[in-house]
UniProtKB/Swiss-Prot annotation:
Subunit structure of this chain's protein: Homodimer. Forms an RbcL(8)-Raf1(8) complex. Forms complexes of many stoichiometries with RbcL with and without RbcS. RbcX and Raf1 can bind simultaneously to RbcL. Interacts with both RuBisCO subunits (ccbL, ccbS), GroEL, DnaK and alpha and beta phycocyanin (cpcA, cpcB) in pull-down experiments with tagged protein. C-terminally tagged Raf1 does not interact with either RuBisCO subunit, suggesting its C-terminus is involved in binding.
Gene: raf1
Spans annotated as N-terminal alpha-helix: 11-194
This protein's name: RuBisCO accumulation factor 1
Summary of the knockout phenotype: No visible phenotype under normal growth conditions, no change in RuBisCO large subunit levels, no change in RuBisCO carboxylase activity. During sulfur starvation deletion cells are protected against protein degradation.
Native organism: Synechocystis sp. (strain ATCC 27184 / PCC 6803 / Kazusa)
A cellular component annotation (GO) from this entry: cytoplasm
Subcellular location: Cytoplasm
Transmembrane helix in keyword set: no
Keywords: Carbon dioxide fixation, Chaperone, Cytoplasm, Photosynthesis
Entry's Gene Ontology BP terms: carbon fixation; photosynthesis; ribulose bisphosphate carboxylase complex assembly
Length: 358
């Protein structure tokens, strides 16, 4: 041993050497091994050092130490010697899984695991179900405070949720294996009769969508008309008010409305009105001057600035102009957006063979 005995006042060097020798030869039962590993660790010997001297790996040390503690709690609970002998022979991995339970629960679960000859994975499932069962504010109808009923309840609950017949059947069989009380068994057996019943049809998914962007919802703009247009036609258009969150519009006036994507310019317009006119009557700089465009003007903006186009009162008609200086004509509205129609794509062109010039 390389460990310094001075750091180990409870176990002398000779005693530690004897413990290591005993572990090396695996003398006694795993319960004894767990106690000896715990003695050495409490005395300051590291798990790696114990492994190097005895061959007990770190994981194995932890398992037998914890399992031996569970075993001792069973002894204190007065468990029958037949059960204790069963676990010494060896079932350390099974008792290790009962560590999450209190002493009384361990005693009951240990008897159940012994009677059903459970493997470690089954004991783990039993302990977890028993622990969670204890968290319930009241016992489910038909089930008792027993680990077998606790696991049977888990199987019963899961089986009711399963539509897959093999999985549902497997859970029912498992629940019947562990059911402790007659009422619990009866509740699970009832699921067997339900296997042949026609399952109720599940309601289809609701086609729910959510507007993520403002542009996904169009804003309805009242239409004043098409050029040539009188000033009174622009002024007479009734404003529209949209009610959020869905943009509900109640329109009592006459005429038409047009949907426009809610770009920033449209969102900020306080009193928008739409007008149709040729592109050339907006600006000579626009290509395809004969193309019909949609012009949105804001009647709330009537103060001139040299960075915008305006709808002006020309007497008998209205006109869209940019003015280098403040105009003498009455400003009816400011142009906020000019919208061109989308390009019309002829799908029939895809069916025609390509033609290339020689």
């Amino acid at each position: 041993m390389t460990h310094s005995p001075e750091s180990n006042p409870t176990v002398s060097a000779a005693e530690a050497a004897e413990l290591i020798r005993s572990l090396l030869h695996k003398e006694g039962t795993w319960v004894d091994w767990g106690k000896k590993c715990q003695q050495l660790q409490k005395a300051g010997y590291g798990a790696e050092e114990i492994f190097e001297q005895s061959g007990f790996q770190k994981v194995q040390q932890n398992l037998v130490i914890v399992a031996s503690q569970v075993y001792e709690s069973l002894v204190k609970q007065g468990i029958d010697e037949t059960v204790l002998s069963y676990y010494r022979g060896p079932k350390s991995d099974v008792l290790y899984e009962l560590r999450i339970l209190n002493h009384q629960q361990r005693a009951i679960a240990a008897v159940e695991a012994q009677q059903k000859n459970l493997a470690a994975d089954e004991a783990k499932e039993l302990a977890k179900a028993f622990q969670e069962f204890g968290y319930l504010s009241q016992l489910p109808e038909g089930f008792t405070d027993h680990p077998g009923d606790a696991l049977a309840y888990q199987c019963w609950k899961l089986a009711r949720q399963k539509k897959n017949l093999p999985e549902r059947t497997r859970l029912i069989v498992k629940g019947l294996k562990f059911a402790h009380s007659p009422n619990a068994r009866q509740a699970i057996e009832k699921l067997l009769t339900d296997l042949t019943a026609q399952p109720s049809r599940k309601a289809p998914l609701v086609p729910v969508f959510r507007l993520e962007e403002d542009q996904e919802a169009a804003r309805l703009i009242p239409v004043a008309g098409t050029f040539p247009l009188q000033p009174q036609a622009v002024q007479a258009v009734q404003s529209l008010e949209q009610v959020e969150p869905f943009g509900l519009v109640s329109y009592q006036g006459e005429g038409a409305v047009v949907p426009v994507p809610q770009w920033q310019a449209i969102l900020t317009a306080e009193d928008p009105v739409a007008i149709f006119c040729p592109a050339g009557q907006v600006s000579e700089s626009l290509a395809r001057k004969d193309e019909q465009v949609l012009v949105v003007v804001d009647r709330s903006k009537k103060i001139w600035n040299d960075g915008s186009y305006f709808l002006l009162n020309q007497g008998e008609t209205v006109a869209i102009q940019w003015c280098e200086t403040e105009p003498e004509r009455e400003i009816l509205a400011q142009v906020v957006l000019v919208l061109r129609p989308k390009k019309i794509f002829d799908a029939n062109n895809l069916r025609e063979p390509w033609q290339m010039d020689d």
